[in-house]
């Protein structure tokens, strides 16, 4: 990681600087606590870069802890994908991977402690009644008829819950706080609920599972977290975070700090809605290159460094704001413009026959792998009597603004010769099948000797050496900036989010490595797809175009 990435400034880092300077802490301990119920997305990348980046920069530690308290929605598949994503982004967690389920015994003991202090009770209201009794933002809640059970009753009933004596939804453990609180989160929140489901870590040992708000703060405390960082929607939950830790016997009391979540335009960040896209086959899977998941972005061709740079550029604040997709695309363009080797590919080919070259002619022309980086070397590219050019690079007639090949006029083939279009051949439908040209043999990488000006330059591949390839032209998955605001977000799907074409690439790409980025000259940035591409059938994903086509 570069120094530019390493030390962004934000209000959280200022707090940490003050805590270290005052002696409040002598080391920094953070954590990244995802729930393993889906794949990580670009919003999680912001949290990863923040938590792991702080630990790195302050010579501290960052734990990877899975918040695995809901066995119904969680799966080991998501655990493994999250670990891969964190490592791919360039970060390492401290020690072993941790799970909230590691602390189920301690959590249960702390629940018993709260019951013993008269601060928790077993409630037998139905979930619907609990919602009804909770009240609203403008009306206070009302006490459950089970709220004033004795400590002995609650201990016995909680043990009954633990032993499977209640059906799901018929009993829960609630904190005894204040049903008239102006903060709904403090109106006797549920601490434990019943779920008869096998857990991916603990099997069937438990049939009661702690809620997030109870688990999160205690797990932080048990791990000695100094700064518990979460997004703004948990701001009110900080009161419950502190209440739990203030009322149990635990030596450490971390502090929670909130920052704005990432809202990326033309994308969905809700795991539920992302899952719907997968389940309803709107996309191929969680790693579909149109998805905002880290695995999807990686498959599309985004680099880890470009995602880290994006997180630096958007910063960490307390104000929610929408980030333009162009900001993310700018990061990968900047990265690949600097680092991606160049190559030639023709996505919509039409054949050019150079008639004043002999049949079987073959020569090799030198091409730089990067125009501004001679240290990246060069390659020899075959040139022959027949080449492919892109269909959009030829017109029978054109105005002066068109700087490509026109019937009766000249253009330069990139790093090769000047050619002139003499005649064309069409099929029965009127589609051009062949363009017959002549070439100027004295113009290999130099201007014509007679001083005539040839302004246009187009890319090409030798027909005799070209390798067939499929090109997947990905675009934004949604056609509106805020699809989540639509009544039916699926109605805002961009019908042109994927176009597939068949064409050719130069021979040097025959063994293209999966996810290795290239700039296909004049076309955009591409990488070989890690799922579909093979030596027998090359498939390239367009990561991003050379410029933003959504401007205006």
Swiss-Prot record:
GO biological process, one term: glutamyl-tRNA aminoacylation
Location within or outside the cell: Cytoplasm
Catalyzed reactions: tRNA(Gln) + L-glutamine + ATP = L-glutaminyl-tRNA(Gln) + AMP + diphosphate
An example Gene Ontology CC term for this record: cytosol
Species of the source: Pectobacterium carotovorum subsp. carotovorum (strain PC1)
Binding positions for ATP per the UniProt entry: 35-37, 41-47, 231, 261-262, 269-271
Positions that bind L-glutamine: 67, 212
UniProt keyword terms in alphabetical order: Aminoacyl-tRNA synthetase, ATP-binding, Cytoplasm, Ligase, Nucleotide-binding, Protein biosynthesis
Membrane spanning stretches: none
HAMAP family per UniProt: Gln_tRNA_synth
Molecular-function GO terms, alphabetical: ATP binding; glutamine-tRNA ligase activity
PANTHER family cross-referenced by the UniProt entry: GLUTAMATE--TRNA LIGASE, GLUTAMINE-TRNA LIGASE
Motif extent ('KMSKS' region): 268-272
Keyword RNA-binding found: no
InterPro entries for this protein: aa-tRNA-synth_I_CS (IPR001412), Gln-tRNA-synth (IPR004514), Gln/Glu-tRNA_Ligase (IPR050132), Gln_tRNA_ligase_bac (IPR022861), Glu/Gln-tRNA-synth (IPR000924), Glu/Gln-tRNA-synth_Ib_cat-dom (IPR020058), Glu/Gln-tRNA-synth_Ib_codon-bd (IPR020059), Glu_tRNA_lig_a-bdl (IPR020061)
SUPFAM superfamilies xref list: Nucleotidylyl transferase, Ribosomal protein L25-like
EC number(s) on file: 6.1.1.18
Enzyme class at the top of the EC tree: ligase
Residue ranges that the Swiss-Prot or TrEMBL entry lists as coiled coil: none
Family designation: Belongs to the class-I aminoacyl-tRNA synthetase family.
Motif residue range(s): 'HIGH' region: 34-44
Chief subcellular location: cytoplasm
Summary of subunit composition and partner proteins: Monomer.
Name the record gives this protein: Glutamine--tRNA ligase
């Amino acid at each position: 990681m570069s120094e530019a990435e390493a030390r962004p400034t934000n209000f959280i880092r200022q707090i940490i600087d003050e805590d270290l300077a005052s002696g409040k802490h002598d080391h920094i301990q953070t954590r990244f606590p995802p729930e393993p119920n889906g794949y990580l997305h670009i919003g999680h990348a912001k949290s990863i870069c923040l938590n792991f980046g702080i630990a790195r920069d302050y010579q501290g530690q960052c734990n990877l802890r899975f918040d695995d308290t809901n066995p119904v929605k969680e799966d080991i598949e998501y655990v493994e994908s999250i670990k891969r994503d964190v490592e791919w982004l360039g970060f390492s967690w401290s020690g072993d991977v941790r799970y909230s389920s590691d602390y189920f015994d301690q959590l249960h003991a702390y629940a018993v402690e709260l019951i013993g202090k008269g601060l928790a009770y077993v409630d037998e209201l139905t979930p619907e009644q609990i919602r009804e009794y909770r009240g609203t933002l403008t009306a206070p809640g009302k006490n459950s008829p089970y709220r004033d059970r004795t400590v002995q009753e609650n201990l016995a009933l909680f043990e009954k819950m633990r032993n499977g004596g209640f059906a799901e939804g018929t009993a829960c453990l609630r904190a005894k706080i204040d049903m008239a609180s102006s903060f709904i989160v403090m109106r006797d929140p549920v601490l434990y609920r019943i779920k008869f489901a096998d857990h991916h870590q603990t099997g069937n040992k438990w049939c009661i599972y702690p809620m997030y708000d109870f688990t999160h703060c205690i797990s932080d405390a048990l791990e000695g977290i100094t700064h518990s960082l979460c997004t703004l929607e948990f701001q009110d939950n900080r009161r419950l975070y502190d209440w739990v830790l203030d009322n149990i016997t635990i030596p450490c009391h971390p502090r929670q700090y909130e920052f704005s979540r990432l809202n990326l335009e033309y994308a969905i960040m809700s795991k539920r809605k992302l899952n719907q896209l997968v389940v309803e086959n709107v996309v191929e899977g969680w790693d579909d290159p149109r998805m905002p998941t880290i695995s999807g972005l990686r498959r599309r061709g985004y680099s880890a460094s470009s995602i880290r740079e994006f997180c630096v550029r958007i910063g960490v604040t307390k104000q929610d704001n929408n980030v333009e997709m162009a900001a993310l695309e700018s990061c990968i363009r900047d990265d690949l413009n600097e680092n991606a080797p160049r190559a030639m590919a023709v996505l919509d080919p039409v054949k050019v026959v150079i008639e004043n070259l002999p049949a079987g002619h073959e020569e090799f022309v030198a091409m730089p792998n990067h125009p501004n980086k001679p240290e990246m070397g060069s390659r020899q590219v075959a040139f022959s009597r027949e080449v492919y050019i892109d269909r959009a690079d030829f017109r029978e007639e054109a105005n002066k603004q068109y700087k490509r090949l026109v019937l009766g006029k000249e253009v330069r083939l990139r790093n090769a010769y000047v050619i002139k279009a003499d005649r064309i051949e069409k099929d029965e439908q009127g589609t051009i099948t062949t363009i017959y040209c002549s070439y100027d043999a004295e113009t290999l990488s130099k201007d014509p000797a007679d001083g005539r000006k040839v302004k246009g330059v187009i890319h090409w591949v030798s027909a005799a050496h070209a390798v067939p390839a499929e090109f997947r032209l990905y675009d934004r998955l949604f056609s509106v900036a805020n699809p989540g605001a639509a009544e039916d977000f699926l109605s805002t799907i961009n019908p042109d989010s994927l176009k597939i074409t068949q064409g050719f690439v130069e021979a040097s790409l025959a063994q293209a490595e999966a996810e290795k980025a290239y700039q296909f000259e004049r076309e955009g940035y591409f990488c070989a797809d890690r799922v579909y591409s093979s030596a027998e059938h090359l498939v390239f994903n367009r990561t991003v175009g050379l410029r933003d086509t959504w401007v205006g």
